[in-house]
């Protein structure tokens, strides 16, 4: 997380076929919706600019988390109240922590506005 925002996010997956549980907390977000995505690279040397595009190994279109046709990195939005920590609680069946399409080592980006 770049800028004034900071936080911790955990990714848990029991088996390669199980959904991934994403939990955590982000501080310092302005009130409203913020895009929550996994980007292609784990490089943060130039902030979010060096993280590349959304993780999309299957060349799909941008979409909502429930869409069949979506980037693997499209995890939807998180809702910030603006005056308290923003909870992250997502269960996703498309991302994985196993194999060639694993999100391990990639960058999570919280976008300023959804």
Curated annotation (Swiss-Prot):
Start and end residues of each stretch annotated as Disordered: 48-76
InterPro entries hit by this protein: SOD-like_Cu/Zn_dom_sf, SOD_Cu/Zn_/chaperone, SOD_Cu/Zn_BS, SOD_Cu_Zn_dom
GO CC entries: cytoplasm
Top-tier EC class: oxidoreductase
List of residues binding Cu cation: 37, 39, 54, 111
Protein location: Cytoplasm
Keyword entries, A-Z: Antioxidant, Copper, Cytoplasm, Metal-binding, Oxidoreductase, Zinc
Reaction catalysed by this enzyme: 2 superoxide + 2 H(+) = H2O2 + O2
Principal location: cytoplasm
Function field: Destroys radicals which are normally produced within the cells and which are toxic to biological systems.
Family the UniProt entry places it in: Belongs to the Cu-Zn superoxide dismutase family.
Assembly mode: Homodimer.
Protein name, as recorded: Superoxide dismutase [Cu-Zn]
Gene that this sequence comes from: Sod1
């Amino acid at each position: 997380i770049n800028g004034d925002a900071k936080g911790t996010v955990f990714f848990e997956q029991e088996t390669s076929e199980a959904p991934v549980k994403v939990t955590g907390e982000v501080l310092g977000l302005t009130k409203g919706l913020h895009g929550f995505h996994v980007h292609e690279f784990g490089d943060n040397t130039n902030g979010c600019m060096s993280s590349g595009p959304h993780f999309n190994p299957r060349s799909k279109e941008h979409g909502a988390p429930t869409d069949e046709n979506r980037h693997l990195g499209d995890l939807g939005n998180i809702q910030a109240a603006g005056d308290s920590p923003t909870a992250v609680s997502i269960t996703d069946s498309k991302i994985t922590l196993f194999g060639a399409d694993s999100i391990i080592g990639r960058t999570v980006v919280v976008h300023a506005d959804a």
